[in-house]
Amino acid sequence: MEKKFKLLLLALGALTLFSACSSTQSDIRGEGNQRALAIAASKTLKKPVIYEKKWKTTGKVAMMDTFTDGKLDGEFRRYYLNGNLVMRGYWKDGVVDGIWEDYYPNGKVLMSGYMKGNKEIGNWKYYNESGQLLGEVPYDQIPEEIIDIKHTNLANFWTDIQNGK
């Protein structure tokens, strides 16, 4: 049951992933309707618009996304309460496409690889919590305990967001 809950949280989180940053972008920071405003502004302004959400308890950035012409496009980032990255990746025209990295809460890379059309492709590297490379294999061969850490970290992130931290 706990695993199903984590997978549900992961799926919900994946549905709301976004992207970040461009030198010709407009910045919109806030919550709630601010995301919808960023999407609309990106259509009107015809340039990338950043949406940024901060943790209420720390004031640090929780997530950064970029919208271009109303779609997710470019780098996205998610952050732990401590300010370290949870994950970062890239969207292209609304589809996950590019380098993808997941992180331990201490800031070290957990795993990294490449996404194309919302799917993991090629070999992925995975690391221990000290940052030491443990292996490089196709995504479906990454040890289950590494994937479980990834899912747990993401589920915890979305739980913190939902709890208004």
What are these regions (language model features)?
Residues 19-165:
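Glycine/tyrosine- and acidic-biased, solvent-exposed loop/turn segments at the edges of beta-strands
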Residues 9-17:
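Bacterial N-terminal signal peptides
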